[in-house]
């Protein structure tokens, strides 16, 4: 590399002498910049960036011509060779210098070209651009530390440090540099937009919104947390200022004052619509994997429990509320839009036929699959036909939940169970077909509305609606709730959703509830799902429901069901009671057949631990229900297990002793009643 003094002299001289040949000037800056970045020391790189910044500030006319062509080269200086991801950005003179250069370009450069450059660079950012592993990054950094590390304590960091976690806090250095570069580009794009003088600003804002949406969508799963993207979109929307119309517009008979005023009005409206769109998109997409806790808060309120958020969720809630307030400032009619979502959900599901329309089992299976895919098909078709700038309905749903989190009030006073079910299915089933539609945050708000519907609507109305609802819709709801809950890692959320599922099973017709349980036992690939419905089946078979169906008594039963408690002291004459599931020979035989299949699976060479646990669950249930269960069926189960136990070695079968003990318990019962 040439001496740095010579390089700086050449660049400085070029700004003075080559103003007529700007292409050569840009080429010179690019060549020397590349050379210094690859071969120079930290101090040499710092001097180059500082000199370039000074030249850009002192030569505004030249900056106006070439500024848009420099950002790509400047971003190359933001690399692991120049930036210690463990250090403070405020002490890194290269980072500070690059930011100053971007600022100089944003206020002096040709705004339209700068905007296009910023959007192109933001679109091209990808984590694969920083492909080395974290450990290799750290080792390479240590190797070059003597030449590249900045001197200690230069200036304080003026950036928002929350957006740039240290190496240990970040998922990877890839994420660190992706955040750093995108932060600079977001600011650059916003500053460029403000300076564009045009009668049609929506054209440029629309381009920015489109690029930002693509960037957010592409990286929503890349970042370790969603706070960075939430902040960037929020800051962009908050700081956007609609530019004034150009003052040099010539009004004449071809373009009158009335025409001018109409264009200004339409442009103003379109800009607001674009910001509304970005606001609803920006709140929903970054938090696809973050629950809002609206359902948790409502559940705690129902049970008079204290609702507490961790520091992690508190920070999210603060941003949620900022978005909520911003939506109001943009005149988003949250309640009206939410009602539009409900209407759309009705359109999707209102035509689902009743079970009686299915002539055979094959037709039933087709209809069940159809219900699963209805929302996904609708969403794909809607996206293909979408021509206008509309709100992101995921964001609208989130705002309905944030309204409750923020105000402790419900967005709508009345929500019937049918609409709540349609809403839940509309925003959860598409994710079963494409991860594009996966959104934990929206799902948590949808569950909140299910809770709200079954606890505020009169019980008789809820039961009537569920009875009249298509069985295919009801079963899809139950299956999706169970399936998603089985993969839920948060214990509290899993318990709350299981309680919701239990309550729904208490409210739907007994025939539908048992068919659902049996279907899970026969077909579900998830062992936890089978274990869960068996526990529910046990309690629904033992718990009494008043013949008058008193509200308070039903609530008490459901509460006990949710906790899966057993109380053998509740005895009553069979003629005076009815259970949620009345045991009869056909129901017992159906469950018995499922148990026999589990016995067969548990005593094979490739038996899984989940099969053994499921077998133990069956035995626990038979022990609890032994006095009401068919004795002959129980004896068959005991005999099958006895014969299989004799054919295996104790140390080869997990839980061998537990199986033996529980099976002996049943055998002892038969001995005692002889």
From Swiss-Prot:
GO terms for cellular component: cytoplasm. The keyword Cytoplasm applies. Keywords: Cytoplasm, Stress response. It is found in: Cytoplasm. Changing residue 570 to D: In strain: W303-1a. One of its GO terms (molecular function) is DNA-binding transcription factor binding. GO terms for biological process: cellular response to oxidative stress; protein-containing complex assembly. InterPro entries: YAP-bd/ALF4/Glomulin (IPR013877), YBP1/2 (IPR040347). It comes from the Eukaryota. Belongs to the YBP1 family. Present with 3100 molecules/cell in log phase SD medium. Interacts with YAP1. Forms a peroxide stress induced complex with YAP1 in the cytoplasm. Systematic proteome-wide 2-hybrid interaction studies suggest that YAP1, HYR1/GPX3, and YBP1 all interact with the nuclear pore complex subunit NUP116, which is involved in nucleocytoplasmic transport. Involved in oxidative stress response and redox homeostasis. Required for hydrogen peroxide-induced oxidation and nuclear localization (activation) of YAP1. Functions probably in concert with HYP1/GPX3, the actual YAP1 modifying enzyme. YBP1 is not required for HYP1/GPX3-independent, diamide-induced oxidation of YAP1. This is YAP1-binding protein 1.
